[in-house]
Each structure stands twice: as structure tokens, then as C-alpha cells.
Amino acid sequence: MILPTIVHLDADAFFVSCELALKPELRGTKCAVGGRERGIISSASYEARACGVYTPMPTTRALKVCPDLIMLPHTGGLYSRVSRQMFELCETLTPLVQRNSIDEGYLDLGPCGFKTSAEIEQAVHGLQHKIEQQLQITASFGLAVNKLVAQIASKLRKPKGFVVVPSGTEAEFLAPLPIGKLPGVGPKTEERLVGRHGIKLVRDLLARGEAELEAIFGDGWREMRDGALGIDDRPVETEHEDAKSYSQQETFDEDIASFAEIERVVKRMIDELLPKIREDGKRVRTMTVKVRYPDFSQESHGRSLSAGTDLEAPFYPLVTPLLRQAWTKKRPLRLVSVRFSGVEDTPVQLEMFAQNEEKRRRLAAVLDHLNRRGGDAVVQHGHQLAKRPPPR
């Protein structure tokens, strides 16, 4: 019997939960994390979500939808610190942990020697309890035989959910779910599938023939059909010393059409990936930006530097041209990702400006040290600062 050894961890309203761990008196209130002026909602409590507040809703609109919404500013360094602690707890259960984003990831319990599903469930329940007791946040878990089904399961009973999908029941588990539960099907895509094609539930998709699916989803129809059947052979990818690339992606709750907002997301990913590259003693040469549209089509484009680097600055000028080359359709985006490849650990060759580069590297090392000690926002790049209106 195949055991449900793939686990998806999804922290509940992560940014807000981290803030409420510091301000427990606000638990149970309608609150959200975000910028009050010209900002967007980064995370909303479940009480605020019940009033119609979602991510990434503009703050001004959120306050109209929910006038008694309590706005909480970002606490510098808090989220990365709690995220690191959360995944360290995961690694006490298994070394095979994939950090998919700051608040979610996968665990592979295959090598742990569990004999029964009950043993696995007991161990994961224990991890869920540890996270709540030690970090004062909650997380939801999905257990299945593959990543796709585990991810869907983890989101069904939030907050503090725990859903197990036994082996062999994947298609049966997915069939009655709304089509919007499949990864990549956002609200607008779901509205189109329901309104134009009558595909309301996952089982409705499976009732369509191949030709019709291709007409609806284009080249991505096989991926959609396999997803509806619960088929997924992707392994849990752990970080290791001989990594051939470093990557990060972000899927948006609502499609984003703002070029400036996507630029900020990409630069934030650069800022989060390069310290890890430095920590590993590596340098990278190539940056690739990938975008995905609501219909699951995607495009990517990459550029390479003349020499490998472990600094952020050389990659910032590539963000705008790469986005323009990848984002060719005049449509909002559902997902964006950044990937660094051309990984090397050889010293940079001496050049005319080698001394200046070494100074920048020493400065980066100091900033990394400060941010590790006090949090990742102790020292920020200019583009990380929220835009503020001029004084009146």
C-alpha cells in the first residue's frame, strides 16, 4: 500500500498571524497587514476576509469595504524570522523539505520509516502542534501521495486544517470540488470556465473530450486534465550544496495588471535569493523571468551577465527589459517567477573594477549579517520602501 508521505504545509494568514503573535489582544478582530496610503493588503485576518477584504486589494478599497478594519504595518524582519523557524521545525521531522515560499512548502516523509498512515498522521499532527505552541501561529496541512493533491487538501479546511487523501482516491477526492480549487485557476478564470463552458466542478472538466479541452485551455489542456485526475509526479526538491539554480515564484490571489507592482515583486525576489546564494558561497550569471497568464499560458526570458556575481545590483537593470520581453500579452498576470542559473563557485577574475566589487561584496556581507540578527528589513534597498505621498 502506498502511504500519503507527501505533505503540504500552508501557514494561515501568515503575515497577520505573525503580527498577532506580537499583539495577541487583536486576535479575533478584523485586521490586515499593508500600507495605509497608496498601499495594498498583504495579508488579512479571516474575520477581515469574511467582510470582503482580500490580497492584493488596494488599502483604500479595503477600508471602504470594511470601515472598522485595523491596519497593521509590516514589522521588519519578523516574517522571514518566523518562516525560518517554521521550516526548521519541519526539518526536525524530515530532511526533505522544500520551501516553496515564505509561508508554504512541501515535506517528503518517505525516508522516515513510517509503516502506516496513522503513524504519519500522528507525526504531522505533532508538527502542527509544535508550530502553534512555539511560534504562536497556525498552519494547515494536506497529506497525499503527490504534491498537487496535498496542496489542494491543505487549503480546504483553513485555518488549522488537516486533510488526508488516501492513496488511490485522488480523482474521487477532487471530482466534487469547485474548479477554482485546482492550482492556477483564479477567480477570473473560474468565472470564465463556469459562465462560458459550464465547467463548475472538477468532474465537469473530466466530462469533456480532448478536442474540447484543447479548445478551452490551449496547449495547457493535458496539464489541466492530469491535475483534475490528481496526477502529479513532481518530486519534493530540497536545497542542496550543488544546486544548479536558485528560484522563487509567487502566485497572486488576484491577477495583477500593474507593471510597476510586478517589477517590485521581481526585485523583492532578487533581494531574497541573492543572500542565499552568498550564504552558499556561489555566484550566478543568468537571470530568467517567467510570467503566467490566467489561461495557464506562460512566457519566459533570460539574460546573462559577462561574469558571475553574488550581488543584487547587476541584476536590477535587467528587471524591466526582461519583464517587457516576457510579458508580451496585454493581459494581467497570475504568477511571476525568478530563476538564477549559471551557478559557479570559482573566484571572480581580477578586473579593472575588482576592488569596487569586493567593497560591495563586503558591504553585502555586513548587511546580510545585520538582517540575519535583526530581521530582513533592518537595512532595505530603496525599492523596498513603500512610496509615501508628499507632505501636505
Swiss-Prot record:
Listed EC numbers: 2.7.7.7
rRNA-binding is among the record's keywords: no
Cofactor(s) required for function per UniProt: Mg(2+)
Lineage: superkingdom: Bacteria
Signal peptide per UniProt: none
Pfam families: IMS, IMS_C, IMS_HHH
Name the UniProt record assigns to this protein: DNA polymerase IV
Species annotation: Opitutus terrae (strain DSM 11246 / JCM 15787 / PB90-1)
Gene field: dinB
